[in-house]
């Protein structure tokens, strides 16, 4: 089925991993389509949301109606903020877990994004036939683009160019406070205040806002209107020439122009402002003749600046499909050569050729991939009812080096349901909601640390610790927990270690340190002047300092090596929660690194370790390997078949 949203890519190739499911879910309808190849969007169907108890039911109905086989990858644009795994629609009664939905439908990948974020990603690919320019201005290539759209609400987003790709902004800008520009709009604001304590732009220039404007103008003119008049009625009356309806539409478009101008100057949207949503296209020529563009440019000293920025009305029939397709394609391409999808597909292809025991591991991986990722080998073997060597043989049959390699490939493909932004916990959240947000925020912070951690600095820190004569761990307040944990791990290496959480003890001990000694200083803020003075004394005597802290802090700048763990908890007034987890993770990385160094076949190191561990009656290499296993990152002994 050809649509306005279908691109004209000639002879587009089929997706190697099968058709992809695309969805655009609004408060009233859920639209579905299949993308068989890049830009080839077919089988578009629309389902009323009220007819299905859950989103999963609606998707299953579509897949049944479309008469297709397996779908591996799916992406959904939804008219709702997406802030973690749990999604509760504000303008519909659907509530769901992204991960639970993925499992229920058997998808390898399920992305759920805000509908205006998806629409924003479609903008660079729109042709002249899929948009109409309103007024003058010339868009500047590779510049920021703004997007707004009145529908049930007032959606807002933007696109920022970054090298050869675009970054979409998630935004709730429609909730910015409405500011009237003339006496008529003052009257509208006063009328709206009777109903809403906070009157946002969304209240007056989304679809329902036209009704508020209409009723405010009717009250001004002392006209009686029917109680059931809605936006569709007002638009119909305006097209028929009704004076009050025409004035309401004119006022609506003027307010929309003000908001569009605000968005343009806020984003610096020299690439243009695009208008989507379901309301404006229904206005037709009424919008073209409206004061929208004049109000857009009416920014006083910035009038010339706004005059150069073009405004466009999106006319493509299903533009959200284009955007959500682009987001899904980028997500899949960012994975390690598509390794995750290849693993799932290879499991399915090889399943019948596997032994019955290996087949049980395959079924566990397909149906419960996160269990494979998170569980140790002993639990995986127990859940699949096989031996541990069977699990290893299964992994190697897929071309993986072992269980760790298999877990990595599997995990890479499942990050689509893990939010990479901080989710706010709100009063009234249920335990399910706030529990998921706390876990999601922590997982997100760890994944971002993995992406941005300077591993050259990690290697340097491990070398310093491995060669240290003595290691002291300093942490004040909440950071003392991390220091004590580090001491507990590192004393197993036979290196003299101690942890101090008291500033006076730190000062007294640091004064005795010298060349060959190391201080690991853990601090969220990295700014405590007393701690900095203590470290200066030790460094002047020849000791080295490894800092686990935020970037660009005085501590990070002073340290011999800085391991930077930036995160959302940047205000010193906030209790360290995520930061503490990141600091503990850094200690684990350093401990595992030192264990690996000490297990290496180095004669001089082995001799030193042997002397240090003579009391335990174990060789240095064996002891270091034991410590690695003790740290839960070694290989457990294999059970026999």
From Swiss-Prot:
DNA-binding region positions on the chain: 377-396
Gene3D superfamilies: 3.30.420.40, 3.40.367.20, Glucose-6-phosphate isomerase like protein, domain 1, Winged helix-like DNA-binding domain superfamily/Winged helix DNA-binding domain
Catalytic activity: D-glucose + ATP = D-glucose 6-phosphate + ADP + H(+)
Transmembrane regions listed in the UniProt entry: 576-596
Keyword set, alphabetical order: ATP-binding, DNA-binding, Glycolysis, Kinase, Membrane, Multifunctional enzyme, Nucleotide-binding, Transcription, Transcription regulation, Transferase, Transmembrane, Transmembrane helix
Annotated GO CC locations: cytosol; membrane
InterPro entries, A to Z: ATPase_NBD, Bacterial_glucokinase, Glucokinase, Homeodomain-like_sf, HTH_RpiR, RpiR-like_SIS, SIS_dom, SIS_dom_sf
BP GO terms, sorted: glycolytic process
Sequence positions that bind ATP: 23-28
Disulfide cross-links: none
The keyword Magnesium is assigned to this record: no
Region Putative HTH-type transcriptional regulator, annotated ranges: 341-641
Annotated segments matching region Glucokinase: 1-340
Location of the SIS domain: 461-600
Family: In the N-terminal section; belongs to the bacterial glucokinase family.
Entry-linked NCBIfam families: glk (TIGR00749), PRK00292.1-3 (NF001416), PRK14101.1 (NF010701)
Name of the molecule in the record: Bifunctional protein glk
Organism: Burkholderia pseudomallei (strain 1710b)
């Amino acid at each position: 089925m050809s649509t306005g949203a279908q691109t004209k890519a000639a002879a587009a190739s089929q997706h190697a991993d099968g058709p992809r499911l695309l969805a655009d879910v609004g408060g009233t309808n859920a639209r579905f389509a299949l993308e068989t190849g890049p830009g080839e969007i077919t089988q578009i169907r629309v389902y009323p949301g009220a007819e299905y108890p859950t989103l999963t039911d609606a998707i299953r109905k579509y897949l049944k109606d479309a008469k297709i086989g397996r779908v591996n990858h799916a992406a959904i644009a939804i008219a709702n903020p997406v802030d973690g795994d749990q999604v509760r629609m504000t303008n519909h009664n659907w509530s769901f877990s992204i991960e639970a939905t993925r499992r229920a439908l058997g998808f390898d990948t399920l992305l759920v994004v805000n509908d205006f974020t998806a629409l924003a990603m479609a903008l660079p690919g729109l042709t002249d036939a899929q948009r109409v320019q309103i007024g003058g201005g010339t868009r500047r290539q590779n510049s920021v683009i703004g997007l707004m759209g009145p529908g049930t609400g007032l959606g807002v987003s933007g696109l920022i160019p970054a090298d050869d790709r675009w970054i979409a902004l998630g935004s709730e800008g429609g909730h910015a406070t409405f500011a009237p520009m003339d006496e008529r709009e003052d009257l509208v604001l006063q009328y709206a205040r009777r109903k809403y304590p906070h009157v946002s732009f969304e209240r007056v220039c989304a679809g329902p806002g036209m009704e508020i404007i209409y009723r405010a103008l009717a009250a001004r003119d002392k006209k009686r209107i029917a109680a059931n008049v809605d936006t569709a009625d007002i638009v119909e009356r305006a097209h028929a020439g009704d004076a009050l309806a025409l004035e309401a539409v004119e006022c609506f478009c003027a307010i929309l122009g003000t908001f569009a101008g605000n968005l343009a100057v806020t984003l610096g949207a020299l690439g243009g402002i695009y208008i989507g949503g379901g309301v404006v296209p229904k206005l037709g020529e009424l919008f073209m003749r409206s004061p929208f563009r004049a109000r857009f440019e009416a920014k006083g000293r910035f009038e010339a600046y706004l005059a150069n920025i073009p405004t466009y009305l999106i006319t493509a029939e299903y533009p959200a499909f284009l955007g959500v397709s682009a987001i899904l394609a980028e997500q899949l391409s960012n994975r390690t050569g598509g390794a995750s999808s290849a693993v799932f597909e290879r499991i399915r292809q090889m399943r019948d050729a596997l032994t019955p025991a290996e087949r049980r591991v395959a079924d566990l991986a397909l149906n419960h991939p996160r269990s494979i990722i998170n569980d140790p080998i002993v639990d995986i073997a127990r859940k699949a009812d096989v031996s541990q060597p069977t699990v290893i043989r299964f992994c190697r049959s897929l071309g993986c080096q072992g269980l760790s390699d298999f877990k990595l490939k599997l995990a890479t493909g499942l990050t689509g349901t893990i939010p990479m932004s901080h989710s706010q916990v709100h009063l009234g959240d249920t335990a399910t909601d706030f529990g998921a947000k706390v876990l999601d925020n922590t997982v997100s912070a760890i994944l971002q640390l993995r992406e941005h951690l300077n591993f050259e600095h990690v290697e340097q820190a491990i070398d310093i610790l491995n060669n240290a004569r003595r290691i002291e761990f300093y942490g004040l307040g909440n950071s003392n927990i991390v220091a004590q944990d580090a001491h507990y791990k590192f004393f197993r290496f036979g290196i003299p270690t101690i942890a101090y959480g008291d500033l006076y003890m730190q000062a007294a001990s640091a004064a005795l340190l010298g060349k060959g000694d190391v201080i690991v200083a853990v601090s969220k803020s990295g700014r405590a002047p007393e701690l900095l003075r203590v470290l200066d004394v030790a460094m002047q005597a020849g000791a080295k300092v490894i800092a686990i802290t935020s970037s660009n802090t005085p501590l990070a700048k002073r340290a011999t090596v800085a391991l930077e763990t930036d995160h959302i908890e940047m205000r010193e007034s906030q209790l360290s929660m995520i930061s503490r987890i990141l600091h503990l993770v850094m200690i684990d990385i350093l401990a595992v690194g030192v264990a690996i160094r000490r297990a290496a076949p180095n004669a001089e190191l082995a001799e030193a370790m042997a002397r240090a561990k003579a009391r335990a009656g174990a060789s240095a290499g064996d002891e270091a390997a034991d410590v690695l296993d003790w740290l839960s990152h070694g290989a457990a002994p294999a059970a026999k078949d």
